[in-house]
Amino acid sequence: MSSGWAVFSYAVAALAAIAIVVFIVRRRRRQAVTEPSSEVSYLRGLDFLIYDQRDKAIKELADATARNTDDVAAYISLGNLHREQGNIDRSIRIHESVSIRPNLPLQSRVRALYSLGLDYVRGGLLERAEAAFKKAIKEDPNHIQSYESLERVHEEMRDWKAAYECQLELDKRTKKKSSRLLAYLLTEVALEEAMRNKRPKEAISLLHKAKQTDPTCVSVPMYLGDVYLAQGDFKKAEHV
């Protein structure tokens, strides 16, 4: 699970970088001649990012933030680069300082909180990551990336019920139905009910719900059989 999360985090960072870089560079390059030197450094940093020259990009973005402390986009990009380089403490400090700035535009605050959440995930601080993603969602209830990351954090924390509820909300926002994932999460909730909470009836009900959600879920009959066996109901266990 951890390796899968790492791959996901790298993929998110890479796609996000490509998406913003191409757009921003094209839009702002024409203004670079007349803008302050911080703007020039910012654009150079994005250029280096395009060509995967991370160390040079960090230097230029650091110069941009030093010359203009109000350049929020440069700060967030700089923090993301530090995270990719493994400088987690530094990326956390940068994104945290941006996220608490007063009078910050909504999307900038959301982006800073989301980036902060990814920092915490990379550092293994899952409870803090959970809090950061929830704050991002509170600021922007339609921020899909935060829902996706929050669901994965809940899975990492083995909080299956929270993961299920988060995925339901995500499907509602995206107008999709992730039947296979929802069924899987329901089976994990059911297993927790049966094993930890000693509530087999609730577990059986949840497993039937998982079966309705995804009739192809192979875990359902296996778990149902286990629950029936634990109850001593060998007949039902045999005919699951």
Regions found by a protein language model. Name each.
Residues 1-36, 135-152, 156-179:
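Long, contiguous interaction/recruitment modules in multidomain scaffold/adaptor proteins
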Residues 54-55, 88, 126, 160, ...:
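TPR-repeat structural position
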Residues 74, 108, 112, 146, ...:
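TPR alpha-solenoid repeat register
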Residues 36-70, 84-87, 93, 118, ...:
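Alpha-helical segment of the N-proximal tetratricopeptide repeat
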